[in-house]
């Protein structure tokens, strides 16, 4: 019985990870090829409320461009442990030099609290790494997720440039 339980649990984790990878690939596809947004929107219907709010957070870690795949995966796991339970559909992945968190229908104040606590936990768990967070604007409808991503990208770039821990796009004065 125990062996069957372990096998079932392992398969469940494997399927969950495979589904997470597929979802992250769909988002990456939209970020690199915005024309596919309608096609991807249909594919995400089961996992996300595509008519709801989307908000993107980018996490930059100094020297992350030096990480190999194993180190990146280890850091990704550490970062995920630093998040509180996120009470909404979300995805978390590495893309184009940043860890990307995309939340769906999460109140912006809740997201800000979660990212603030995550930052504090990360400082304790990974004291040798300096991290920067850029938080994009909450956007209605999946079609606008790329705009939240671009705004998060601008915010994290500013955070890195001026050595700030966290910047919300709305507070940039742009």
Model-inferred region functions:
Residues 2-13:
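Signal-transmission/dimerization alpha-helices at domain junctions
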Residues 8, 20, 24-174:
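Hydrophobic helix-rich structural segments at or within alpha/beta enzyme and signaling domains
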Residues 13-21:
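A conserved signal-transducing helical linker
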């Amino acid at each position: 019985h125990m062996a069957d339980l372990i096998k079932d649990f392992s398969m469940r984790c494997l399927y969950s990870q495979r589904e997470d990878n597929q979802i992250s690939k769909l988002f990456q596809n939209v970020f690199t090829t915005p024309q596919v947004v309608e096609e991807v929107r249909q594919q995400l219907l089961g996992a996300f409320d595509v008519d709801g709010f989307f908000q993107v957070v980018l996490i930059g870690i100094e020297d992350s461009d030096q990480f190999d795949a194993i180190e990146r995966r280890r850091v990704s796991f550490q970062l995920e442990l630093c998040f509180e339970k996120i009470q909404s559909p979300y995805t978390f992945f590495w893309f184009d030099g940043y860890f990307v968190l995309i939340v769906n229908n999460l109140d912006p104040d809740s997201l800000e609290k979660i990212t603030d606590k995550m930052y504090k936990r990360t400082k304790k768990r990974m004291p040798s790494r300096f991290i920067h967070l850029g938080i994009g604007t909450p956007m209605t409808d999946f079609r606008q997720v790329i705009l939240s991503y671009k705004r998060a990208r601008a915010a994290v770039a500013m955070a890195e440039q001026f050595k700030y821990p966290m910047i919300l796009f709305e507070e940039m004065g742009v």
